[in-house]
Structure formats: C-alpha cells, structure tokens
Amino acid sequence: MCIRDSSNTSVWFDTSGKVHFGHQSTDSPKEATTGFQLIVSDGKLTVGKGGPRHPRTAIGANESGEILWLVVVDGRQKGFSEGMDMHELATIMKELGCWRATNMDGGGSSVMGLINKSGEMKIMNSPSDRFLGLKRIRPLPMVLTIRKKSS
C-alpha cells in the first residue's frame, strides 16, 4: 500500500532489496513505510531555505536504490544541538549521495538505535523527548528496522 497524499511520500523495498520513493509502487513492495515530503528528488533539493530548526529523521538512497542512508539529527538541546531546518537536512542528504530522500517523523521521535552482537540495543543519538522534565525514549507505534542480509 502506498500513500496517495501529494504532500507525503512512500518508501518501499522491492524483493531484490532496492529502495524506492514515491506515490506508486512499480513492484510489489516487500516492506514499506510512509514519510512526509521528498526533500531530494532526482538529485535536486525540493525544499526552500529557512524554516524552523527541529530534531529530524531522513531516509535516502542513491540513484540505483542500492545504497541506503538513515540520518538522525538531534535538536532542542541548547549548547548541544539546535536541530536543522528542512533545507539543511536536504543539503546533508544530497551531500551524502542521495538521489532521493524523504523527511520522516522528527522531533522527539528522532531516535537511532543499534543492536550489537550481544543483542543489546544502544541509543546512538541524544533524543529530545521529555516527560515530567526527564529525558526519555518516546514510545512509538512504528519503527523502521534494517538488518544485515543473511549469507
């Protein structure tokens, strides 16, 4: 299922593991999720300069869809990170080599974890979500999990 809202875009992986972005699947997706707007399309930035700086999450791929980038930007933490506006995020994604990239849910939802060989998860960034003044990992109904392909 792909989102048909013109302001959102779907991200899906085909059966060969290549990533695709857009509103219509050209192949039956094996896995899919939705993001917000495309910030890089056909190697060009699609967002203007300025706007608010927030924690951000983005997913992007090279032109062939064989290399995937997941980026999390911390924010709302004075003296540590103020976040990025959409143009800054799009610029980073393009500089990484993304042909297409989309903005995902951000703010306190911007968290990146890594599971080590022992099966323990380590949070790799400094999430901005707070509850009763305490920093926490926001409970989320959906996460995007990427794992190494089995040999």
Kindly give the residue locations of the regions a language model identified.
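Gly/Ser/Thr/Pro-rich low-complexity, intrinsically disordered segments
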Residues: 1-151
